[in-house]
Amino acid sequence: MIEVIEKIGSKEDFIHFLYLLSKDFKKNLQEWENQTIPDFLEQMASWIEDYSTCPANNIEWERIDYKVLAQIIYMGKIYE
């Protein structure tokens, strides 16, 4: 999955990644540490808190559009 993430360069690539992640969850549930939405979201937040202060961090946190990211995640809740 890391190889797919490293190649994301467009909206289409990101959508493809989301579908792959969904298929992976269905096929390999036992490999997922966070098997519920609350656990998944809480650990995503925890990872951001931890990794954003890590010296090995290679993410440009100030360049992320957090409002768009929040909207994408929220739409997963309400979109039919």
What does each model-identified segment do?
Residues 2-30:
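N-terminal acidic leader/helix
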Residues 11, 24, 47-50, 54, ...:
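Surface-exposed polar/charged interaction patches
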Residues 13-17, 40, 65:
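Alpha-helical structural motif
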Residues 21, 44-47, 69:
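Amphipathic alpha-helices that form helix-helix packing interfaces
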Residues 30-63:
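Amphipathic protein-protein interaction modules
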Residues 57-80:
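Amphipathic alpha-helical binding modules
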